[in-house]
Amino acid sequence: MSTLRFHAIKESLKYKPVLVEKTERRSDLFGKNVFNENTMRHYLTKDAFIGVMNAIQFGKKIDRNIADQVASSMKDWALSKGVTHYTHWFQPLTGSTAEKHDAFFETIGEGMAVEKFGGNQLVQQEPDASSFPHGGIRNTFEARGYTAWDPTSPAFIYGTTLCIPTIFVAYTGEALDYKTPLLRALHAVDDAATAICKYFDKNVKKVTSSLGWEQEYFLIDKMMAASRPDITLTGRTLLGHSSAKGQQLDDHYFGSIPNRALNFMRELETECMLLGIPVKTRHNEVAPNQFELAPIYEEANLAVDHNALLMDIMGRVASRHNFKVLFHEKPFAGVNGSGKHNNWSLSTDTGVNLLAPGKTPMSNLQFLTFFINTIKAVNTHEALLRAAIASASNDHRLGANEAPPAIISVFIGEQLTKVLEELEGVTKGKLSPKEKTELKLNVVGKIPDVLLDNTDRNRTSPFAFTGNKFEFRAVGSTANCGNPMTVLNTIVAKQLKDFKKEVDILIAKKDLKKDEAVFNVLREYIKASRDILFEGNGYGESWENEAKRRGLSNNKTTPEALKARISKQSIALFEEMDVMSKVETEARYEIEVEAYIMHIQIESRVLGDIARNHIVPTAVKYQNVLVENVRGLKEIFEEKYNSVSKEQINLIEEISNHIAGINANVTKMINARKAANDIQDIEKKAHAYCNNVKPLFDDIRYHCDKLELLVDDEIWPLTKYREMLFTR
């Protein structure tokens, strides 16, 4: 292994920045490999184009005749670009994308062949559902599942394959992917938000949920990554002493991007442009060899698809540049981990961002309505929102003084807090003309001025308002954005639905005017949501105590957090909003708990293997060198032997203690794992892995990392942190 380590270092030093050819302007490249609206205008008949646009904009069904026309046009377009295969591209609950490629090629007899692709192939396919996570919805012998075309996300060409974004459902109709519940949640929030918008503008017919993700990642040399079994098998380092220099000088964040990494980014951005992914920002992040990529905001379903596609593209482009891209939330101890901030907002088909203040008191009242309802939604469902970002890898990051804590709270800034306090003082019931004027001019009317200079940022907040959007910062870098976006849009949809019901009752039964009813309900929501608002330091112990006093959940581990998924409140929520049935909700819980168990199990096995098969033999080898040295000293320095060999003997003893510590803890870990595996109840098994197996990782790592500081660098088998983080 030490030979492999030094070979990796030697090879990595030979790498030069991979030449990236100059391309056309970004605006000319954008969407060239996407069957987007512009391409459809060229290839589709008028009827087919109208049919597809109605499906995209209004959710109308596409009849089979139109589907055949679309399929034929898609095929012609794809063949003109050298495409040979097509696939239904979907997002099963594995966390990555899935695809099965079929050729357009069909034989027609007499040694002849043609390219064929019809409406049947476009609209529906049948992959094996039993081979993907299904949470008990399907038996292994009940293999049938369906992928069905999602016309709201355009088909695209990836390599020589036409990729058709699809949903993935069981034969019995239950969702087996991230996209299906997301589409349902987006429909729910559209219905609920549009109904509220009609209080303020009768012309609004549709409300769209927007998402702008910020993808953080590490780039390390491909050869060095290959020399680390832990990175290869788990995506992170399970051991390794921190480098003497890490991020303490703050010299990496926004620094000059290294040439190799920059050329990787340039090629990546070209690929993204061709696929219609509107990437805009790139920069160094806080930790060495950590970077960030962010796009322009898009409709949420498309943004989720684009992020899933991007992560796949990044891995392929990184390999061409002799890099390995690490998405794990905490690949290296001692430096910052990676997240994926989800910037979320709602906008109307009339061009209004509902989370941005307007120019009139009425438009500002609309802003406050959506702003306060979002806060109320988070207050009611904070535990479910925490469950939406729970994973074995994100547990390493949350609450680690570099990322938001595991306690969900909302930050809105001092000035907006004052606005809410003033609204809280609104008179109950009817408002006098003077009160209305005061409220509209001096409270609601001044919101744009308040936001102009006073939307400060609090990086310790997991859910923060940043001027014209909410930023969900607790999402992990490996996550499929569909999960948190499904939950967020669902809870907001439910809250808006309840809000409308309460406002309509006040208008009908209390004889209040519309704005009076809105103010009255908002006032009560502000009072009910005080506990979720927090402006202070989320890292402090005092916040944990305060959050407990407020009744907020503090689920620090995934097994704890995921329970909120199957609470009576959550199941009822998803059923009422037609997002997921009870069966689907419970299946997702089971899938996510199983994924947690498997991740910890794999890491445990890999750590035990590295510790016993790589670290201990290396330590013994070095110890033998020291023993021979001590023997030689005894032969040469008979009288002074004790004094001249003292340090070597102490070192031999210290190494022995660490070897004993490794072996004892690995044995404990194996026994704890066996005991956990004997548990049939999946929830109890997850807690056993969390509480009995995982804590031993740190004990084993402690001894291994201490040995790294003691053993001769020439024979140490694993590539070290300083080599991985500072080779560029």
Each language-model region and where it sits:
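Active-site-proximal loop/turn and secondary-structure-junction residues that shape catalytic pockets
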Residues: 66-70, 90-92, 120-121, 168, ...
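C-terminal amphipathic alpha-helical interaction region
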Residues: 523-728
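Histidine/acidic residue-rich metal-binding segments in metalloenzymes
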Residues: 15-119, 123-139
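Active-site proximal loops enriched in glycine and acidic residues that flank catalytic Cys/His/Asp
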Residues: 66, 90, 118, 295, ...
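Composition- and surface-driven signal marking solvent-exposed, interaction-prone regions
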Residues: 231, 307, 329-330, 356-360, ...
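Short linear, low-complexity motifs centered on an aromatic residue
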Residues: 95-112, 130, 228, 235-237, ...
